[in-house]
């Protein structure tokens, strides 16, 4: 945004706000040919001047206000509170309630005002008064604002300045595609994205849609992205006469509108769309395929730590399990019955499900490892997660450390556990992996690393 102080011909002063349009490029690229460049310059014999759009607009502001003199100007940016409360228990139609909340988000309360460094004080004060802000909410920014827009620079054709593209491999057990169900029936397949391609997961749903032996598909959808091949496969499956259920989380933050559009499109195609629970988000990533085979009805399951989004799967590290193990498939079937409103269940055979039994299951595993360490002396816990902030869980890890259990934590984001406290956290190590990909997998491992029976993912 620009705030401009204008003076009319009669000497009166006015203030005008000008919003930089979102539907034009953030930068204009001006190429100069023939400029002298160093021989080893990675850009080659080209020079490109990058001009931010807001600088061009600021330079030509007088053209937008004929008859007025531009006295002063300054750029500012507003950050609003995007947490809009949805009265789910009072809403007759959850979809419409979420749609209304998305509309209201653009009018959320202002939590931060960023102003261009050197912006005239009278302009800053004008905004503060109009928006009724406190001094602590105002930030003077040296340099450009809205850095997310600078990702446009990555579109420049300078491969020498970029990372070498990573090409994922196929897990050999997922090939050939037309034998995928046969291969899963033989043994479990663990996928590690993006090192192994997410295409195998897309193949699973697409094969299920086309396979005449498949009776039905059930799937949870949290963030699926635009032009989703998975959603299209679900709709194709319904068109081919299969029973298809999609549990769509409408309250996935900043993806609400996209999920609403997909949900409505699937409903038009005859897919049974369910919107989850009041007061909870469906964050599990599950796909259940029911298939009629010569030996009877058999289920196949995909359980993942990442969204069913081929786009983000190229940049996030995630794990996915393809299995036809009866106990896991029965658990997933029961869980879908809970999510679609046909059952109540607190405990499962192999799955830890929140909010009913995940906490208690992990706590039992930690306490069991403490007791095993007292007997055998080689206790080990490995945790890989996005955040570690739960006070009770942190205290329990301290308890494990005090007992002598070696605890390794790989935490991508916020970690409230403190290492190096003598006598309390001596046996705990916390690391964060920073690299090309965003670490997103969740793994909890209890017991010696060579003992694979003690792992839980």
Identify the meaning behind each predicted range.
Residues 1-381, 399, 403, 415-439, ...:
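N-terminal localization/anchoring segments of enzymes in phospholipid and broader phosphate metabolism
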Residues 386:
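Cofactor-pocket helix-loop regions in the catalytic cores of large enzyme subunits
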Residues 406-410:
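Hydrophobic alpha/beta core scaffold segments
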